Amino acid sequence: MANVSVAAEWQLLYDRYYRKPEIYQMKWKHVDLSRNKVACASFGGPIAVIRDDSKIVQLYAESALRKLRIFNSAGILLSETVWKHPGGRLIGMSWSDDQTLICIVQDGTIYRYNIHAELIEPNMSMGQECFEQNVVECVFWGNGVVCLTEGGQLICIFDFKTMKPSKLPDVPGLAEDDLLQPICLTVREPKYTMSGIAEVLVAVGDDIFVVEEDMVQTIRFDEPSVDDSEMQNDDSGNLIGVVQKMIVSPNGKFLTLFTHDGRIVVVDMETKQIAIDYSCESALPPQQMAWCGMDSVLLYWDEDLMMVGPVGDPVHYFYDEPIILIPECDGVRILSNTNLEFLQRVPDSTESIFKIGSTSPAALLYDALDHFDRRSAKADENLRLIRSSLSEAVESCIDAAGHEFDVTRQRALLRAASYGQAFCSNFQRERVQETCRTLRVLNAVRDPAIGIPLSIQQYKLLTPVVLISRLINANCHLLALRISEYLDMNKEVVIMHWACAKITASPSTPDSHLLEILLDKLQLCKGISYAAVATHADNCGRRKLAAMLVEHEPRSTKQVPLLLSIGEEDTALVKATESGDTDLVYLVIFHIWQKRPPLEFFAMIQGRVLARDLFVAYARCHKHEFLKDFFLSTGQIHEVAFLLWKESWDMGKNPMASKGSPLHGPRIKLIEKARNLFSQTKEHTFESKAAEEHAKLLKIQHELEASTKQAIFVDSSINDTIRTCIVLGNNRAAIKVKTEFKVSDKRWYWLKAFALATIKDWAALEKFSKEKRPPMGFRPFVEACIDADEKAEALKYIPKLSDLVERGEAYARIGMAKEAADCAAQANDGGELLERFRKTFVQNAIFDTLLMPFQGAS
């Protein structure tokens, strides 16, 4: 009998059953759909209602000011606001995919509202054409809209996220003065087009055009397979005739047309074949048309809702009140003044169980449970009959339970599945548990207080993540949290949204008390971003609360920037240095640098070693003057001196400061300033003396360049200066440098010997060697000659070397093996020198002969 009562509610359309269960008795009062513009969101979303200003209606006790009211699907008021926007009449209103209410008025201005009836700034516009010509019609899809102006222009916004209006190409006949012929619009959504961009279908009279972003095409349809003589054919050859209304199927593959002669024509958009051609009793265009899933089309006239299928007679539903058709992916919700129904095709699993006279395995299993509850042996008989198909029967019961809105029927079907599962060893046990979890979630959100009547197919398409997002946007945080916990999903999004909403809703709650409330919930989720909540608190003007919240943020990368934004520079510097992240420290340093006076800034970083060192490292490269101020403020005079000294070197490297230029004067002054600063500290006596010597040398070099007119002296060393003077023949200047800087005789001999060898002035070198006995002997002369590759000149000085080892090595270097061997034999080093020479002169037997006595001794 239960099967009979369930199936009795069904309607048969050809070979497919449809059902129309009541979902809600509407909770609202004094709402007449015929007097209002209504926008219903898909997936069981909210309903927006506003009095239709294009109709003359009796106000009764209502205010003359219109109110925009937002209800849930059960008719419970969520929010309302007074509509007082300029721009003319409200032309169109629809919900976007993210549940933003889009309202377009006559002059093309777009007003956006959230679910709480709060206006989202800024207001947008459909463009200048809409403003000048006025909007007469709007067609919305999930994330876009196309508007028709009085001048026949099509203006489209393809994505509400960008809000960029685009003018579509002109449609033939649409911009003509005679617009008395029927015009209708519909949209094929981007996800169903080849280009990935929405296509606007425009019917002008008996022509249908596909309008894309940059082109317009005319559609021609092929003849159907039925008797051609019954088809209407106008003079232009169009088989369909004048179109008065049209809609696109949910999958974008079919186009439904209602013609001037009362025919419903369904066309395949890909093949251009007419799939259905049905003549209605009335030629009046329906007020509404909608697809019911993919199997039938609904047409609504006053008091009559007709459902047409591919074959067979239509099904009629009669209403004594106005209704709104709300298409869904698996059916149509029917909203009236008093209730909300859901018209859908009966799922195959449900049909197999409850169809009158059904003997399917699932029906027998459901019947077996009934016998089992009545302690009848018939239960065992039914199980034996379906033993081979028991898994299939269990699966059908589970699937049917998922499609039910009635909780009692859900339980009965799941009990039948569990009963059959006990006798089915190879069935996946998790399947029942998964369906139970899904149904618990669906039943929770279907509660009238929540008012989201999702079917299981809609729930899977929407996904739990989006459902939770919609719950928290509706401030149903507790339910969202419980669902997140139940489905093992991340709770952070829910708790964070609740915390932000709590701060917004508690302007008079003391910061300390509100902090306790927030922490009590925020601590439920590990790793939650306290910084994000603190940012919201700061945006709400609760800076103290923001500072208290950010103290609990464990991630320095989020904590420090927020501390800076709320003016807590001291705390930010502490947290940044404690983290050891140099990027964060630099962020704080630059922020404070810009915000605070220099002395205050210096005092802040002086006590923080890492911050101070990083600042000094940066300033050394880019901000010398500022760094000098810092060192002076901290008493580090010697550091200022080093900076001055470095500046003098940098000035010398300046390509604009050519040698011998007047810039050497400023350089010397900088060095002298550095010397004066060094002299003020006992620890830097050496640096003071070095700076003094540097300045003195720079002056002499500048004078030399001026006298020789050769820019080759400045920035060279004392040795190089002396050597250059000798090379140039300026012996007097070389002696002056030697005397001025107290160059030792030993170094003088080395420098002069090599300088004379460089210019190959061998006579002068020989004369120099004979002036007086060299303090280091004749080795500098030997080295200079060998270095100049002058063996003959070297032989003048090698015999004068007193050290046998040095003499032998000198002979060896110029290739005189015998003389080198003689010196090595006379040297008192145990044959070590001979051994070295033997390795140097591989083919020379002299060293082997001389080494024999030493080898015998060893």
From Swiss-Prot:
**Is Membrane found in the keyword set?**
yes
Q: What happens when the gene is disrupted?
A: Absence of vacuoles in the embryo and accumulation of small vesicles and autophagosomes. Embryo lethality at late torpedo stage.
What this chain does, per the entry, is described as: Required for vacuole biogenesis and vacuole enlargment in dividing and expanding cells. Involved in the docking or fusion of prevacuolar vesicles. Important for the function of both male and female gametophytes, but is not essential for the germination and development of pollen.
Q: Which is a GO BP term held by this UniProt record?
A: intracellular protein transport
**GO CC terms in record:** CORVET complex; endoplasmic reticulum; HOPS complex; plant-type vacuole membrane; protein-containing complex
Q: What is the lineage of its organism?
A: Eukaryota, Viridiplantae, Streptophyta, Embryophyta, Tracheophyta
The gene name on file is VCL1
The protein in question is named Protein VACUOLELESS1
Question: PANTHER family per the record?
Answer: VACUOLAR PROTEIN SORTING VPS16, VACUOLAR PROTEIN SORTING-ASSOCIATED PROTEIN 16 HOMOLOG
Q: Which family does it belong to?
A: Belongs to the VPS16 family.
Q: Which organism is it from?
A: Arabidopsis thaliana
* InterPro entries on file: VPS16, Vps16_C, Vps16_C_sf, Vps16_N, WD40_repeat_dom_sf
The UniProt entry lists membrane topology as: Peripheral membrane protein
- Keywords for this entry? Membrane, Vacuole
> Where in the cell does this protein reside?
Vacuole membrane; Prevacuolar compartment membrane
Chief localisation class = membrane
Subunit and partners: Core component of at least two putative endosomal tethering complexes, the homotypic fusion and vacuole protein sorting (HOPS) complex and the class C core vacuole/endosome tethering (CORVET) complex. Their common core is composed of the class C Vps proteins VPS11, VCL1, VPS18 and VPS33, which in HOPS further associates with VPS39 and VPS41 and in CORVET with VPS3.
* Record Pfam families: Vps16_C, Vps16_N
